[in-house]
């Protein structure tokens, strides 16, 4: 069963979502799956901020405005701005996933980032397993200090993505891989 969920999980962007609302208790169940990610030293560095309803719409508008105000003119893209403004239109919930950096200096930051990434993957596999739609976005100001300030995060924390969750009526596209496994794996016996 998990094999097919992994192979069938697809990115479904908010524009492909139909605007139907996922019950909050289902979102909580999906976040509980995320909580079971592997992590070094039991630091559990993943944190989630969940937006829904009017608060999600407001966040998307404010994120777009922050993008406009903090992006140099030569890098600003009107399409990106419009996508940020309208991202909530089809989504049910928006989840900001970030790494809460622990105080243990023996745990490298990279391990904490990997743990949060694993938590996001758990969330997305749960989404796929329930026949829901999900999109892990790293666009806009995800990697910018301005978003961290907006969210009230600490300097050492790191936003790893905005996950849009919803429902889609569109059939899933067939998955494909471009690079053969023989080029990705080296066996030493």
Q: What label would you give each PLM region?
A:
Residues 4-13, 159-189:
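C-terminal helix-cap and adjacent tail motif
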Residues 147-160:
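Short, electropositive alpha-helical surface patch
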